[in-house]
Amino acid sequence: MLKRASFVEVDTASLRHNFSAVKSIVPKDACVMAVVKANAYGAGAIKASEIFLQEGANYLGVATLDEALELRSHFSKTPILILGYSPNANASMLVDNDLSAMIFSLEQAEVFSQMALKSQKRLKVHIKIDTGMHRLGLEPNFKSIETIKKIRALKGLEIEGIFTHLSNADAKIKTHAKNQMKAFNAFLEQLLDQKIEFQYRHAYNSAGILSLCNGNENRLLNLYRPGIMLYGFYPSNGMKESCPTILKNVISLKAQIVQIRSVKKGEFIGYGEHFYTNEETLVGVLALGYADGLMRALGNRIQVAINNQLAPLIGKVCMDQCFVKLNNIQAKEGDEVILFGDKSAKANDASEIXALLNTIAYETISTLSKRLERVYI
């Protein structure tokens, strides 16, 4: 039984389909790291991870220690990589929970080494290389080769992987992404010349998987990191139009009408006088607000699906509630409203919502609050 009259519906068949789409694109002998950061982009990290592991994922990727610990409590043996920065103070928890960490400096590696030795354990690390994102990482040059040699000499560390991140592989013209891969491959080859090898070599996110697996840029890669495509979205609308791979929507945001009331002409609905009733108006109240992840700016800007009919979201979205106009809509209290997700029910999908707000589907779904229950179908 639901604890609230609003929830996130997650289509598990679509999760499986999208993972299969990844497997159909990457090389047959490749490993796959399912990226489940930000609560699996809103889908629920535990259940999504369980499904991806059942479908053949070799690794799970997250952004923070807390995300990794949540997964570790459910998956005791599964490899988990924290792709984001791990503060030195977290070193002991990384070691104690058998988590893999991203590193990008000798100083960080030395701290992790000391903590691993103190615990009489080994900490797995993946070295980040900056090939053009200019966010985190060692630069692919001779100095970094010397740094990697010093890191490899540290006791207590298992240098499991090396990786980079593509910043613009969803662009129509792939010059920058290909230049990044050219730099990464050249660096890997220089390391090989020095007899430095890694169990895992990875670079391709969803955009890379969808657009760069047909060339030879990935010839040295053996691990792939799908993220947004697992949840049914293409990294950009342009890529959706040009990509033959079919992805299926996973996430729908739903709520029930908890009260219907008639408001006379000449009244304001909600905070701030943002919707004026120029006629007698039938208003449905939903127990869903911006604290749940329904962005406040969507008030007076979208239509929602109710019984295969479209009704406007009116007034400003409140922290915990919002309003729909039900004039000429067949609806009753308790009926389900789809804020976004299921296109077959006439609802907007998350990418359309994002376009209205000059953002992306990633933000629309990953900001869905944990206080919303996830209902898996």
From Swiss-Prot:
Keywords attached to this entry: Isomerase, Pyridoxal phosphate
Pfam families: Ala_racemase_C (PF00842), Ala_racemase_N (PF01168)
Pathway: Amino-acid biosynthesis; D-alanine biosynthesis; D-alanine from L-alanine: step 1/1
EC number(s) stated in the UniProt entry for this protein: 5.1.1.1
Superkingdom of origin organism: Bacteria
Single GO molecular function: alanine racemase activity
Cofactor(s) listed in the protein's UniProt record: pyridoxal 5'-phosphate
Residues noted as binding substrate in the record, renumbered to the chain: R135, M319
Catalytic activity: L-alanine = D-alanine
GO biological process, one term: D-alanine biosynthetic process
Active site residues of this protein: K37 (proton acceptor), Y271 (proton acceptor)
Residues recorded with modification N6-(pyridoxal phosphate)lysine: K37
Nucleus keyword on record: no
Keyword Isomerase: yes
InterPro entries: Ala_racemase, Ala_racemase/Decarboxylase_C, Ala_racemase_C, Ala_racemase_N, Ala_racemase_pyridoxalP-BS, PLP-binding_barrel
GO terms for cellular component: cytosol
Family of the protein in this entry: Belongs to the alanine racemase family.
Physiological role: Catalyzes the interconversion of L-alanine and D-alanine. May also act on other amino acids.
This protein's name: Alanine racemase
Species per Swiss-Prot/TrEMBL record: Helicobacter pylori (strain ATCC 700392 / 26695)
